Structures are given as C-alpha cells and as structure tokens.
C-alpha cells in the first residue's frame, strides 16, 4: 500500500494588521452606540460625522463652520434628507453585522468538529502502540493501520475545504492584535466583536491545521515502523528456525561420541582432529546466534518486545548453543588430557617407576608427587630419590667439601645413568626439541619429552637396557629439586641444559665450552650479566646438596669479577679467557673438576700400599707425601682424615688419579728430598692452595643474578641445609680464622674451612691470582683475638637474653594448662572443649619453645667449645721448637693433581700444595698480649657451664 501523503493547507492564516475602512467602521460604530434610535431636536444641531465612502452625502460646510447660535433653524427638507441618510446607513451596517455573524458561525462548527475528529484519531493511533513481537500480530496490525490511513485520507478533502473557507473568511475580515486595554474593557464595540470572531476562527483553523499535519506525519512514521518491525521479525524467525535445525544436527553428532575410556590410545589423535573439525564446521552457528540476539536487542530498543513464544525459542537456542560449546570444549580437553596422560609423550608410562604401596600422582601444574598409601603420606621426592639422598649421608665423613660434593654428585650421576650420556647426544636432543634459546621457559611436559628422547637415544646408541620410566622420573625429580624447589612447574632452558651438561659423561673442558656458548653472543663473547646467569645456574647443583657455602655461597658476583680479571679491562670476555680462568679451578666451579677426577679415578689401581690402613693395591685416588719418603695414602684415609701415629697429614701431598709414571716418581723424589731440607717455618710462609680462591663479600641488592624459584610453603630440607652451612661457614670465618693457622686438620672442627684455606690450585706461573702471603701471627694476633673476643661476648649476651626469654615463656606454657584445667572444673560444660583446645595449643607452643631452646643450646655449646679451645690455646706453654724457633703445630695441605690425565696440557707441572708445620715463634710481647686477652675472657665468661645448667634446667622442666 502506498503511504498516504497529505498536502498542507494551501493558505497562510493572516495576522490581520490592516484594516482598509477603519474610519468607516469607527464612525458607524460610534454612531450606533450614541444614537441607537435617531431623534431630531430643533434646538440642538449635532453635526454628522463625515463619511469617507463614495456617494456618501456630506453636510454643508456652512453648517460645519457655523455656530449653533448663528445658524438658524434648518429647513424641513434638509432635515428629512439628512435623517433618511442616517437611517439608510444604520440599516446597511446592521445587515453587514448579521451577515458576518452568520458566516462566522458556519465556520466555527465545522472547524470544531474537525478538531475533535483529529484528536480522536490521534488517540486511536497512539493506542496501536507498542507492537507485539509476533509476526502474525504485526501483520494484523499492519492491515489495521492501512484501514486507518484510508479513513484519514478520505477525510482529507473535507478538511481542506473547511480550511480554505476559513482562509477566505479571514482574508475578507482581517483582525488586529488584541491589546490589553481592549481585552480588559467590558464594553465591546461592534468592530471589536467582529475582530473577536475573526480571531476565534483563526485559532480554530490553526489548531485544526496543526492536528492534521501531526496526524498525517504520525501515520507515515507508524507505517514505516510496522514495516521495519515486520521485516526484523521475519528475519529473526527464519534465523531461529535455521539455528534450531543446525543445533539439532550438532546434538545428534554429539550423541554419537564414545566415552573417553572406551577409546583406543592410538586413536586419540584422530578423535582430537575430528573434534577440531567439528568445532570449525559449526563455527557459523556462533555468528547466527549473535545475529539473532542483536536483532532482538534492536527491537527492544524500538519498544518492540518478542512474544512469549519467540522469547522462549530464542532462550532455548542460546542455552543449546552454550551447552554445545561446553560439550565440545570438555570433549577436546578430555581427549587432549588423555593423549597427554596416556599417549606416547604422556606421563602415564612414568607410573611404572614406583612400586606398591607408592603411587605417582600429578599436580595441576603437571608436577609429579608421590603417595604412600601404606603410611598415608605424600612427598615431592621419588622413593628411590629419597633412598639415594639417605645413602649420600654416608659421605658426610669426607672432610673436604669439594670431594664430598663430587662424591655425592657421582652417586647421583650413576643413579640417573647420566654418566652414560655423551654431550653430543644431549646436544642432538636439545636441537630436536628447539632448546636453542636459553631464555625459553620449559614446563614439566617439555622436560619429560626431552628426557624420554634422551634415554631412548641412549638405548639405541649403547645397546643397553635402560629403565626409561625410572630414569626419566628420577632425572625430572633431581632437576626440579635443583632448579625448581618451589615446584612451580617451570624452569629455564638454560637451567635444564646446565644440569644435563654437568652430569653427562664428557670431558670437563667440553662441558665448559658448551656452557659458555649458551650465554655468549654471536661473536663468542659474554658480558658480566650473562656470565653471572651461567654461574648462578651452575652453583645450584652444589646448593641442592647443601654444600654451597664452601664454594662462595649463592652469590656469584665475586666469581664474575674474578673471571673478568682475565678480560684485560674489556666489558666482555672471550671463550679462551673463560677457559683459562676455569682451568685454575675457581672456588665456585672447583667441584666440577673434582667430579671429573673422581670419575676417572674410580677404575684406577695403584700398585702400592696405604701407609695407614695397609690397603694394597690402592683404588681410586692415591696421595703421596712430599715430605716423607715412601708414604702413600688411599683416598678413604686421606679424605676422612685418618692418620697413623707417625704419619699425620701435616706435609705437602701429591694427588694421583692415574697410574704414576717413572718421570713422575723421579720428580716427586726430588721434591721430597728438597722438602727434607726445608723448615716448618718455610711452609708456613709459603702456603699454596688447591683452587683459585674467590673473596666472598655481601653484595648489594642490585645484583643481576637471576632469581631462583620460590620456595615451598613448608621448610625445604636442602635450603635449610644450605642456610645452616652458609651461616656456619660465616661464623667460622669470623670467629675461628686464627684456629686454622695453628691447628692441624685432625684437630679442626670444620673441614670446609680447611679446604677453603689450603686447597686452591695455584700455579707457579700465576702468582698474582693465587698466592696470598699469610699475615704474621706475631703482628696481627692481638687484633684478631680482640675482635673474636668482642664477637663472642655479643653472641653470649644475645644467647643469655634469649634463654631468659624462653625460660619465661616456658614457665608460662607450663602453668597455662594447669590454670586451664582448674578453670574448666568451675566453668560450665560448654566451655570445656574451648579450654581443652586452648590447652592443646599451649602444649604445642611449649614443644616449639623447647625445640627452639634446644637449637639455641646447641649453638651455645658450639660457642663455648670454641671459647674453651681459645683458652687452652692461650694457656698452652711454648713447645720445643726447631732451629728457627718455630712451633710444632702444622697444617696439612690438600692434594695436588698429577699431570697424566688432567685437562691441562702435557708438560705443565701442577704445583705442590704445601702447608706450614707451625705458626711461628711467639715473642714476649705477644705473650703479654695473650695474657691480657685471657683476663678479659675470664671476666666476660666467668662460668663456662652456667648456660649449660640453665638450659638443662629449662629442658628438665
């Protein structure tokens, strides 16, 4: 149906500011008002007003200009003529007024009818809104509106005719604007009444015209709105039918899915691909659902709401689509999890690495943990790894940290079967798994894939049977303990490659070259930050064993500075310079070189007899004395500090991890003969170490060393070991530095300090970095002892205060349960449980306090033991000295390496590691100083056993 187009009113209603015969109407109205009935008086002659109209008679000028007294009585004929004219004019005026009133009355009634009709139709049009959100109802509304528009259109000619009549009337009878003075006056003249009628007609015509224009415009807008709504509803209805059909088809496919447990493992990749294709095939459904929802939203904005049936259908489509999405996502996740857990690259095959009652479980971040169903406990470590750590405790009797660490790592290496893996094989696996980027972060699944490929390649190359699940699980456990003790499930690729490279069965030089290449740039150069990252990763290996304190601690900045001394002032270091530094076996990396020597020495037999245990032949390391002839010691006796009565480890010793040659025997004989003519004082003045020492200091927080993984919420065993070892090393270095200058290793309580001071490899050609002349005891003993005394006094005060505080807390904890029990009897029954719970908490607190007291007591005993040894040292009388007057106390040196199979070039002689037999003679001034210090010690510690008594009393209570 074509929209109805109404034409506007073809006239413009006049505002009527003109009045063409104003004077005429003015005089006639005034005449009507003053002379409603004409009367003639002989005595008074009233001049008639002049008339402007044509043919109107005028009075004689003489009558106008003359006075009444001067004019004589009018003639009868003239009076009659004037009177007749007045009557005629009055009659015409009355006729005109009656005609005007009749004409305006005929216009007012139709205009009012039109106004009422238009108002009624406007209300009917408003009643048609809002539209219903249903196609049938909107179509019905469309037909109704079409009939409505036809009715309005048919009324148009009549309305136009009435408005044209009103226009014609107003053009004949214009009016002026209504003034306030006229509107307030009660008496209206005929002219004013005519203007009021004209004004009223004009108002009615204006209202009718505006209502007509408004109605026609609303009809057109309503027609467009209905058409637009019907179009959207038809589109929504068609889209919902199509979506419903598509969803029904998809739900049918979903119903055919088999349970995950019924699928074959080999078919999992096919099912995963099928689910992905299914998801892509039904991806257009998402766009269709979005389109339908958008159309419904647009209709709602237009105040058109879907019917109950359509709303329910749309809601069902949305619900079905969401359910289908969830089903597809869950199905895909289940298939992927099953493929990951049971597929070729999954952790499912690792479940065979444990035996009953153990079970291997996986945390949400894919980190494995182990459940003991018999003990109902869980732990991070593999049961075999726990057993391995327990066996490592047997090596704690080794006095030298580097050898103790190397021996432990050797056991770990053999348990993980990494001693059979070559670095070349490991590099191939790294390249296959795209691990070239050292900053790449690996998750547990990636680590498992790499380890699995590594051990499978080992089986192929060596032709040996390897328990791949056990080796993979154990290696993963060890890597997580070293580089991810917090079990975050992430580790850097550099960490992974460093761990594998350190324990693989390859020459140490190749390992170091490879590790340097991982942090070097394209020009084979490395800056301090990247070198620090490498050393940080490497130091994590001994840290996990609790041995990091002997290698400079976790802070690698001193080692970085030591290495960059070889860079000749450049900001980067080259590979050759790095290897030159590492060949000196720096303190932070000496354990790696010792591990290599331990590996080589395992299968070596020396055809000689141990001078202490009489073992023959000597297996492993062989230690030859360079002070006494024909004195050889096996590795067990030397590393554990055993010595016979006449063969204490007081003299320079040479270490061999390969069979000796005749040239080496001759060289050692010459060295021994030379040392026979050297005094003990010579060895005290020329100590040499078995490795390059690194000055460990507290660094600022701005170190660029990478942060390690976060710790677990509970106390980590290895971290606690590291913490205690670091603290012990720090205390010993501060408190007992002078003990190591005067006591033999057999009498020293800390073998790590012995290693740190006397095991640095230093060559004769590198004196600048290794040889540090010891300070004379005669010149610095007083200052050192005073510092130690002040430190011990502070420690003693702190411990005494802590013991007093713990004693007070302990007494409160003992009294609190008694008070709680007494009050429980007096209180109501409902408070018994609360009091008992409080008592249990207090007992637990008491246990914690007792444990802490025990720790403090042990620490106090250590300090008192050191104090007692200090007193004995100060009170010890001078012993018989040699020709030079030196004391008899001496220090044993750590082993020297043989040159047979060492990475150093053939022909270069490794220096002897020697130690002094005595500290030196004490002068009379030093004796006086020691006596003075002894007095201070007596005043500072009046009773050595006082703290023991206090602690025992607390523990007994």
UniProtKB/Swiss-Prot annotation:
Positions of Zn(2+) binding: 610, 613, 634, 637
A single GO BP: synaptic signaling
Return the annotated region ranges for Disordered.
877-923
Q: Which SMART domains match?
A: SPEC, WW, ZnF_ZZ
Point out which parts of the chain are ZZ-type zinc fingers, as ranges.
605-661
Membrane topology is: Peripheral membrane protein
List where in the cell it is found.
Answer: Postsynaptic density; Cell projection, Dendrite; Perikaryon; Cell membrane
Does the UniProt entry include the keyword Zinc-finger? yes
Where Phosphothreonine occurs, the residues are 910
Which keywords fit this entry according to its UniProt record? Cell membrane, Cell projection, Membrane, Metal-binding, Phosphoprotein, Repeat, Synapse, Zinc, Zinc-finger
**SUPFAM superfamilies assigned to the protein according to its UniProt record, in alphabetical order:** EF-hand, RING/U-box, Spectrin repeat, WW domain
Q: Where is it mostly found?
A: other
MF annotations from Gene Ontology:
zinc ion binding
Name positions with the PTM Phosphoserine: 748
Q: Where is the composition biased (Low complexity)?
A: 877-894
Where does each Spectrin repeat begin and end?
A: 102-179, 231-337
Keyword Cell membrane listed? The answer is: yes
Tissue spec. comment: Detected in trigeminal nerve Schwann cells. Detected in brain cortex and hippocampus. Detected in brain membrane fractions and highly enriched in the postsynaptic density (at protein level).
Summarize the protein's role.
Answer: Required for normal myelination and for normal organization of the cytoplasm and the formation of Cajal bands in myelinating Schwann cells. Required for normal PRX location at appositions between the abaxonal surface of the myelin sheath and the Schwann cell plasma membrane. Possibly involved in membrane-cytoskeleton interactions of the central nervous system.
Q: What is this protein called?
A: Dystrophin-related protein 2
Origin species = Rattus norvegicus
């Amino acid at each position: 149906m074509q929209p109805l187009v109404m034409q506007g009113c073809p006239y413009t209603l006049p505002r009527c500011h003109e009045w063409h015969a104003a004077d005429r109407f003015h005089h006639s109205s005034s005449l009507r008002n003053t002379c409603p009935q004409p009367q003639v008086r002989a005595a008074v002659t009233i001049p008639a007003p002049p008339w402007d109209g044509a043919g109107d008679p005028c009075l004689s000028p003489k009558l106008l200009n003359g006075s009444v007294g001067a004019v004589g009585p009018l003639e009868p004929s003239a009076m009659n003529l004037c009177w007749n004219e007045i009557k005629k004019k009055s009659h015409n005026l009355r006729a005109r007024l009656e005609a005007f009133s009749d004409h305006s009355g005929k216009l007012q009634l139709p205009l009012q009818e039109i106004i009422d009709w238009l108002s009624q139709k406007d209300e009917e049009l408003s009643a048609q809104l809002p539209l219903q959100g249903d196609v049938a109802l909107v179509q019905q509304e469309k037909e109704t509106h079409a009939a409505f528009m036809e009715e309005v259109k048919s009324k148009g000619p009549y309305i136009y005719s009435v408005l044209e009549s009103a226009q014609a009337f107003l053009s004949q009878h214009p009016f002026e604007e209504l003034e306030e003075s006229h509107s307030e006056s009660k008496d209206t003249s005929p002219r004013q009444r005519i203007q009021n009628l004209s004004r009223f007609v004009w108002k009615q015509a204006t209202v009718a015209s505006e209502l007509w224009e408004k109605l026609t415009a609303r009809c057109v807008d309503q027609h467009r709105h209905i058409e637009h709504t019907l179009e959207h509803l038809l589109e929504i209805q068609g889209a919902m039918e199509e979506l419903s059909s598509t969803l029904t088809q998809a739900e049918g496919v979903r119903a055919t899915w088999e349970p995950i447990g019924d699928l074959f493992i080999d078919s999992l990749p096919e099912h995963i691909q099928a689910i992905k294709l299914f998801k892509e095939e039904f991806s257009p459904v998402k766009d269709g659902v979005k389109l339908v929802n958008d159309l419904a939203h647009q209709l709602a904005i237009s105040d058109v709401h879907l019917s109950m049936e359509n709303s329910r259908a749309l809601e069902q489509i949305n619900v079905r689509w969401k359910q289908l999405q969830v089903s597809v996502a869950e199905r895909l996740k289940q298939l992927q999890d099953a493929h990951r857990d049971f597929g070729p690259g999954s952790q499912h095959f690792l479940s065979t690495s444990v035996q009953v009652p153990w079970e291997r479980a996986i945390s949400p971040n894919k980190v494995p943990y182990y459940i003991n169903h018999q003990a109902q406990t869980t732990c991070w470590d593999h049961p075999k790894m726990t057993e391995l750590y327990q066996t490592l405790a047997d090596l704690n009797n080794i006095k030298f940290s580097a050898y103790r660490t190397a021996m432990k790592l050797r056991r770990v290496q053999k348990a993980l079967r990494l001693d059979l893996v070559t670095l070349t094989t490991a590099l191939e696996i790294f390249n296959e798994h795209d691990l070239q980027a050292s900053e790449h972060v690996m998750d547990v699944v990636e680590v498992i894939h790499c380890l699995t490929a590594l051990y499978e390649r080992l089986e192929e190359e060596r032709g040996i049977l390897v328990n791949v699940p056990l080796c993979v699980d154990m290696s993963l456990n060890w890597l997580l303990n070293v580089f991810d003790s917090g079990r975050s499930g992430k580790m850097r690729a550099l960490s992974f490659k460093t761990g594998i490279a350190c324990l693989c069965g390859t020459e140490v030089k190749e390992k170091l070259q490879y590790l340097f290449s991982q942090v070097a740039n394209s020009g084979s150069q490395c800056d301090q930050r990247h070198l620090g990252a490498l050393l940080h990763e490497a130091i994590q290996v001994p840290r996990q064993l609790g041995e990091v304190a002997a290698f400079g601690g976790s802070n690698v900045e001193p080692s970085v500075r030591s290495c960059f001394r070889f860079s000749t002032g450049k900001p980067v270091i080259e590979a050759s310079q790095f290897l030159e530094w590492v060949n000196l076996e720096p303190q932070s990396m000496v354990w790696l070189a010792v591990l290599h020597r331990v590996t080589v020495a395992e299968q070596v037999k020396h055809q000689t007899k141990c001078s202490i245990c009489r073992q023959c032949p000597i297996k492993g390391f062989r230690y030859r004395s360079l002070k006494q002839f024909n004195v050889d010691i096996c590795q067990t006796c030397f590393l554990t500090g055993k010595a016979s009565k006449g063969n204490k480890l007081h003299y320079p010793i040479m270490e061999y991890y390969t069979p000796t040659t005749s040239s080496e025997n001759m060289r050692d004989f010459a060295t021994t003969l030379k040392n026979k003519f050297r005094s003990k004082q010579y060895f005290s003045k020329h100590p040499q170490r078995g490795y390059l020492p690194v000055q460990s200091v507290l660094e600022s927080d701005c170190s660029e060393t990478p942060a390690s993984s976060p710790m677990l919420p509970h106390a980590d065993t290895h971290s606690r070991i590291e913490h205690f070892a670091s603290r012990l090393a720090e205390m010993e270095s501060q408190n007992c530095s002078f003990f190591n200058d005067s006591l033999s290793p057999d009498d020293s309580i800390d073998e790590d300090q012995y290693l740190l001071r006397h095991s640095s490899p230093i060559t004769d050609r590198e004196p600048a970095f290794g040889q540090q002349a010891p300070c004379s005891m005669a010149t610095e003993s007083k200052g050192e002892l005073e510092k130690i005394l002040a430190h011990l006094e502070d420690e003693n005060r702190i411990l005494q205060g802590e013991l007093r505080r713990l004693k007070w807390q302990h007494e409160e904890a003992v009294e609190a349960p008694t008070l709680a029990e007494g009050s429980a009897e007096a209180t109501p029954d409902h408070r018994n449980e609360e009091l008992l719970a409080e008592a249990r908490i207090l007992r637990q607190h008491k246990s914690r306090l007792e444990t802490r007291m025990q720790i403090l007591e042990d620490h106090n005993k250590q300090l008192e033991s050191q104090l007692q040894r200090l007193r004995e040292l100060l009170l010890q009388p001078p012993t018989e000295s040699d020709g030079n007057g030196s004391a008899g106390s001496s220090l044993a040196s750590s082993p020297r390496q043989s040159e047979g199979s060492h990475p150093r070039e053939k022909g270069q002689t490794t220096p002897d590691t020697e130690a002094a037999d005595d500290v030196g003679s004490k002068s009379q001034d030093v004796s006086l100083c020691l006596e003075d210090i002894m007095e201070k010690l007596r005043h500072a510690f009046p009773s050595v056993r006082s703290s023991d008594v206090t602690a025992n009393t607390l523990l007994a209570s």
